Amino acid sequence: MAFSSAKWLEERGDDSDVMRLRAAYAECVKKLEAPAENVQIPLETFPNGQVKSRVTARRAHVFQDTGFVWGEKVRVEQFKEDGSLFASLDAESCVVDRKTKSGWVEGAAQMVYGDSSVKGRGIYFSLEREFIKIFSQSEIRTGHTG
């Protein structure tokens, strides 16, 4: 899917989901008890059962009551239907909402999408909307040459 600057400009001003997830991150940290280690959680599958997106983390806790996954040393991956990697996000610490497939990164992260990458600190992302918003220390690299 090609980048749409009009779509990005339309969505960039609405921070309601950002605020919701930042609050969820803080609440998850307060409730955290004995996180599991080396966790892998599918977020979504294709109709054929193959994983479309997943979260892996060195340490994680799944909050069954809210659907949130809190993790440290997190990798969120999105795949194409043929199983190849479509996009990935590596983060120090984040919370992911399994229902909306969106998340908030507390600390540093890098997202790779094709031959482009973005990194920074304090990052909101939405897999469904293919949207990312970086709140500080942003850096964008693209392989686009034309």
List where the protein language model places each region:
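Mature-chain termini and adjacent capping regions
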Residues: M1-G146
